[in-house]
A protein has these predicted regions:
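Conserved hydrophobic helix-helix packing surfaces used for dimerization/oligomerization
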Residues: 29-31, 156-157
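Rossmann-fold NAD(P)-binding glycine/threonine-rich loop
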Residues: 102-119, 123, 226-277
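Glycine-rich phosphate/diphosphate-binding loop of Rossmann-like nucleotide-binding domains
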Residues: 36-50, 132-221, 234-242
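Glycine-rich phosphate-binding loop
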Residues: 86-96, 101-104, 197-230
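Short, well-structured alpha-helical segments in soluble
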Residues: 73-85
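Positively charged, low-complexity intrinsically disordered leader regions
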Residues: 1-27
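Anion-binding alpha/beta catalytic cores of soluble intermediary-metabolism enzymes, centered on
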Residues: 92-152
């Protein structure tokens, strides 16, 4: 039976530690989330982030903007937040309405307040092995692996999905830790063959049953980033959890695996930004 990599418990531990640090340091990290439109999934994600930020003692604000918001209006809002010394982290909830270019918007956030880690400056730093601000989901995956003492050195790591949110930064974090990394995508030939040789499998596609028992080798480690809602209403990942759990050595559940860690890393990066701004050294 596989070890279940419990992201929910680890995220709670990290949040409790952050709350204690905020109280001891008397620093009040400021986090603003910009939500444009009424996307139901985004509403849930933002609500979870707001609740978590308030629990650890942050000054947390969610600015809800109408679906009709123009790119210029959003950029002006970001400009104001960039100049506000009480704000240490700015997050724009994706996806944005079609009239707004998300890349232009993300680049408008100054790198020091880019707690999502999506700014080209921060991604470029990651390329140079500077992990000061890293996309939150890959960072959360690394922390989860470290918590369970899963060493990546010399391991064959297969990442399914090449987004700048998960796949590409995850590949760099894996390389930084001595893994041999292969990134698979929609044009990868014979995906099952690639998966079969992997020691570490990270799937971030959004396709149920993409990874099955017959695809994975014994004692592999699986990180399931996918979130899929079935017609029954059940939330599942990309991996057939019940099918593979007796085959692999460790696996993240969905929900309760990577998702909580993403929020925990968002809070941690906001806190570290606040410490840097206030000249408090961790």
């Amino acid at each position: 039976m596989a070890i279940v990599l419990d992201g929910k418990s680890l995220a709670l531990k990290i949040r409790q530690e952050l709350k204690q640090k905020v109280e001891e340091q008397e620093v009040k990290p400021g986090l603003v989330v910009l939500l444009v439109g009424e996307d139901p999934a985004s509403q849930i994600y933002v609500r979870n982030k707001e609740r978590a930020a308030n629990e650890v003692g942050f000054h947390s604000v969610v600015e809800r903007l109408p679906e009709t918001t123009t790119q210029e209006e959003l950029l002006e809002k970001i400009k104001t937040l960039n100049e506000d010394d009480a704000i240490h982290g700015i997050l724009v909830q994706l996806p944005l309405p079609k009239q707004i270019d998300s890349q232009i918007v993300l680049e408008a956030i100054i790198p020091e307040k880019d707690v999502d880690g999506f700014h080209l400056v921060n991604l470029g730093k990651l390329l140079q092995k500077d992990e000061s601000i890293v996309p939150c989901t890959p960072k959360g995956i690394i922390r989860l692996l470290e918590e369970y003492k899963i060493d990546l050195t010399g391991k064959e790591m297969i990442i399914i999905g090449q987004s700048t949110i998960v796949g590409r930064p995850m590949a760099l974090l894996g390389l930084n830790r001595g893994a041999t990394v292969t990134v698979c995508h929609s044009r990868t030939k014979d995906l099952e063959k690639q998966i079969a040789r992997a020691d570490i499998i990270i799937s971030a596609v959004g396709k149920p049953n993409l990874v099955l028992r017959e695809h994975v080798k014994k004692d592999a480690v699986i990180i399931d980033v996918g979130i899929n809602r079935l017609e029954s209403g059940k939330i599942v990942g990309d991996v057939d959890f019940d099918g593979v759990k007796d085959q692999v050595s460790a696996i993240t559940p969905v929900p309760g695996g990577v998702g909580p860690m993403t929020i925990a890393m968002l809070l941690e990066q906001t806190y570290l930004n606040a410490c840097k701004r206030e000249n408090i050294y961790e």
